[in-house]
Curated annotation (Swiss-Prot):
Binding residues for S-adenosyl-L-methionine: G66, S115, M190
Protein's UniProt name: Probable GTP 3',8-cyclase
Residue sites binding [4Fe-4S] cluster 1 per the record: C21, C25, C28
Pfam families hit by this protein: Fer4_12, Mob_synth_C, Radical_SAM
Species per Swiss-Prot/TrEMBL record: Thermococcus kodakarensis (strain ATCC BAA-918 / JCM 12380 / KOD1) (Pyrococcus kodakaraensis (strain KOD1))
UniProt binding sites for [4Fe-4S] cluster 2: C251, C254, C268
InterPro entries documented for this protein: Aldolase_TIM, Elp3/MiaA/NifB-like_rSAM, MoaA_arc, MoaA_twitch, MoCo_biosynth_MoaA/MoaC, rSAM
Task performed by this protein: Catalyzes the cyclization of GTP to (8S)-3',8-cyclo-7,8-dihydroguanosine 5'-triphosphate.
Cofactor comment: Binds 2 [4Fe-4S] clusters. Binds 1 [4Fe-4S] cluster coordinated with 3 cysteines and an exchangeable S-adenosyl-L-methionine and 1 [4Fe-4S] cluster coordinated with 3 cysteines and the GTP-derived substrate.
GO biological process: Mo-molybdopterin cofactor biosynthetic process
Length: 307
């Protein structure tokens, strides 16, 4: 297993498969990738990377984007990398889950996170730029059958969907999904912009209310986040709160190494001066051991953003 200079183990790989997306969410951080990548990793290159990572103790992989399901070879990618990992998941907008949930599960995907920022069609369209709520809800229904546990990612934004938090808690209970309430996040230089101030909605008061309502709480090892079990008319809802801004505990317990869609290691979502190219080495005939050394160099560059 690899450890960074701060004693944090690296156990998770978060791979952006593409920067292409069929949605236009106005707040999207694009996994920290600022520019559209035209040189995407091939399925063979992704498989090789994950195989090497598994030798280093990295056995959990999350596929992201952009929107990973817009890649026509998504099933091949999943099938290729599953033998090397114990937990293979994906973050998706859910637009193609109705047709893909079962094939993805058959290919080896274990579970999904679905971005669901509103249950109101007009608000959903305003946030995502797409009139696609109904298709996503149908996709979630299919995902629950084949890719459980399904997590719903709701980025809470002031004046847009902050009034839907408790409706979403009930929806999670009703559908048997797990709700993640997520604060808007941004690098330091963006946190004082008019955009951020307009939409940032602090979740601390919400978490305090969840604490009071919960019939049970647990703590996740990842980021030391609490899980709240909330009684509703539809049964118990499982709710997590992601508050990354200025959260030193969140960063101190990060175990992720990110991979950009154009073949670079990225040590932190909020940094852009930390990219380490491995794809050029791969395509120029580098051995597995040489890729391992690039892995190690990337891990040693990791440091908590908030500390």
């Amino acid at each position: 297993m690899l450890y960074d200079r701060f004693g944090r183990p690296v156990t998770n790989l978060r791979i952006s498969l593409t920067q292409e997306c069929n949605y236009r969410c106005f707040f999207c951080h694009r996994e920290g990738q600022r520019f559209l990548a035209k040189n995407e990793l091939t399925p063979e290159e992704i498989e090789r990377l994950v195989r090497i990572a598994s030798r280093l103790g990295i056995r959990k992989v999350k596929l992201t984007g952009g929107e990973p399901t817009v890649r026509e070879d998504i099933l091949e990618i999943v099938k290729r990398i599953k033998p090397y990992v114990i937990d293979l998941s994906m973050t998706t907008n859910g637009s193609r889950l109705k047709e893909l949930a079962k094939p993805l599960a058959k290919a080896g995907l274990d579970r999904v996170n679905v971005s669901l920022h509103s249950l109101k069609p007009e608000v959903y369209k305003r946030i995502t730029g797409v009139d696609g709520l109904e298709a996503v809800l149908e996709g979630i229904e299919e995902a629950v059958k084949y890719l459980s546990p399904v997590k719903l990612n709701m980025t809470v934004m002031k004046g847009l969907n902050d009034g839907e938090i408790w409706d979403m808690v009930e929806f999670a209970a009703k559908t048997g999904t797990i709700l993640q309430l997520i604060e808007l996040e941004a690098p330091r230089e963006m946190a004082e912009t008019a955009f951020f101030r307009k939409y940032f909605y602090p979740l601390k008061p919400v978490e305090e209310k969840l604490e009071k309502l919960a019939v049970e709480t647990k703590e996740r090892r990842m980021h030391r986040r609490k899980k709240y079990f909330i009684p509703t008319d539809y049964g118990i809802a499982e709710v997590e709160v992601v508050r990354a801004m200025h959260n030193t505990v969140f960063c101190a317990n990060c175990t992720r190494l990110r991979v950009t869609s154009d073949g670079k290691f990225k040590t932190c979502l909020l940094r852009n001066n930390d990219l380490i190219d491995f794809l050029s080495a791969m395509r120029n005939g580098a051995s597995d051991e040489e890729i391992v050394e690039i892995f190690k160099r990337a891990v040693l560059m990791r440091e908590p953003y908030w500390k």
